[in-house]
């Protein structure tokens, strides 16, 4: 009896530890890729063509990051590095390139995914879509998919853009005779079903998935298509915002973007897997803003993780290892420990800088993150000319400020994005928009300047990695000056017109002139040498100065051809 009791006691003691060990072994969060089934990476990015290399070192680095699937080309609209973006691009040279990439991927344990724009436009400018209601177009893509599946038997996943990537869909409002009067959300599901069925029939002994990116479609159209599509062998690839691109912050995305929430929810209810895209760099090195804001990287990953039905994530712009990235360090740390709190991961990635320096680096990165959040993203899509031009160091013209805005003839731009951006196709805008943009640029600049102060304190510690800290500090200082200079351009434009408006009232004119003088002094302090001359001229004769600086041409208006009138036959 005693022996039986001892045996039972041993079972009781051993069972829990065995169960815990089993849980640890099977805990999905411990799989090295944030617990996801998929972590898709892009080798290189459109701005760093030299990093589009599929050598052993590059691929091992991505494997260590947690990536388990690779996109076979950078697939960017401008075709940097002559990368494939359409099935039609796969000539003998490109096929050989992909064969090599697939062999390299298999060598290092990666699966692969192709990325195409379908259907490719018949004419690019003016746009003429390839009509998906035409039997000839349908047959063409059935044959192209069949050829692809035969040529690349290792590839079971294809990602498709039906807008952008040189693809386009006919409008229901004309002029296509087959599509006029038929909504896109009634036409596109059948075409997508045709593509994925062709994949399935070409690879009957394997699981294939057509991943669709509903880029440029409105929220309503996308949701309607999700409801109508056959979910078998179909998946969604979604941005973190229905109206913005894949920026590394939560403004207008995740919890606050009901469009993303609804799409993910409908997909979940229909057993459609979703892969969420993220950008860990903000198009680095395209704009004057670099990836030194790890908190935003963390929040972006948490945002996707909190949604039901997200089976994986995909880097949107690509990985360029030759360009240093603090955000990359955070991404790597999060993928290994997705349940760890932010503070723990920040301490981990800051540790190499030294015990005394690490807290200073964390504070500097936090101010950079706040600066990114403060930037006026919602004014215009064209952020480069609005303080983030990489070549700017704070200089500006002495003409009145303008806001470049842009739009395209797509469903999303004519609907949801008009709520996301204040200006899309406006020729004029209320001065308050200009005032708002200038004030927020100044706020973003001040936060970046605070980051520079902490980078300077970190450098003074002289514990280690000083050259790296200096690199971060110098770049953020340049960005600070660029945003500050652009903010001053906005402020001076408004102040100058204010002064012209009240110049008949000496007391009021003096108040506004004091404001202009203060702004010019800030311009000088920001390192803009030309502002010193302008300040001297203004102090000498304010009224004469106002006649030649930031002067609106109220008698002149520029017109250009209405390019939408050209329709390709």
Question: Model segments located where?
Answer:
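Sec-dependent signal peptide recognition
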Residues: 2-10
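Hydrophobic core
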Residues: 12-17
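Sec/Tat signal peptide C-region and signal peptidase I cleavage site
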Residues: 18-22
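Feature activates predominantly on carbohydrate-active enzymes
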Residues: 23-142, 146, 150-162, 272, ...
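Alpha-helix capping and helix-loop boundary segments enriched in small/acidic/polar residues
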Residues: 89-96, 128, 132-139, 178-187, ...
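Short, internal active-site loops enriched in acidic
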Residues: 119-120, 163-167, 215-221
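Active-site cleft segment of glycoside hydrolase catalytic domains centered on the general acid/base Glu
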Residues: 127-135, 162-200
